[in-house]
Amino acid sequence: LAISFFACWAVLLGRSALAMALVALAVVIDNVDGWMARRTVGRNLALKHFGAHFDCYADYISKGIFPVLYLLTATDLQVVSIPLALTYLMAIAVRYSYEFVPDRDHIGLSPDYMIAFLCLLQLAAPQLGSAFIPTLMASLAGFAALAVASFPSPKLKGWALVGFCLFLLVLAAVLLAGDQGMNWLTAGL
């Protein structure tokens, strides 16, 4: 939750690369935390229930609110981006409501993939030039639709989850290395 908050703060300060690195790290921590929680023996039902709901709130910040803040700052708060921002927020809220429907498979595409895509998009931003904003807007619209689509989506497990988390960590490292405000990392080299 704290890392997601700092990612939102960084994007509002105009530090998009740092913000993306932080939100990628938040997704990795979310996946590791979930893995650990499922393996914790002897957790009482109340704590399990609380943890699932609290996790969902934290996810909504990193995978719902953060992408919208990224869009709004990238478009300099242009009014044209507001309907898309609201649509995306509603789609992600609906997607997370599926988490609490008993005996139901995971429906729609996980918002984790949106974060990975946004990291890649941030890295490609200089090459995209004026196509960056339309690409970002189309991506958010597409991911919003996929998040609430009626197809079942498998949950990443085992080595697939490890690979995805490692991919996000590499993206975070590349984003940090390219962040203009992070020159102190290489100052002594």
Predicted regions and their residues:
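Membrane-embedded alpha-helical segments that form the functional core of polytopic membrane enzymes
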Residues: A2-H53, Y88-L89, S139
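Hydrophobic side chains within alpha-helical segments
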Residues: I3, D33-M36, A58, S62, ...
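Membrane-interfacial alpha-helical segments at the cytosolic side of multi-pass membrane proteins
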Residues: F5-V11, K63-T73, A116-A124
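Juxtamembrane transmembrane-helix termini
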Residues: A10-L13, L72-D76, V101, L128, ...
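Structural signature of hydrophobic alpha-helical transmembrane segments
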Residues: M20-I29, T75-Y88, S130-G142
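C-terminal ends of transmembrane helices
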Residues: W35-N44, M90-D105, A145-K155
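Multi-pass membrane catalytic core of lipid/isoprenoid biosynthesis enzymes
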Residues: R39-S97
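C-terminal membrane-associated helical module and adjoining short loops/tails
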Residues: H106-L189
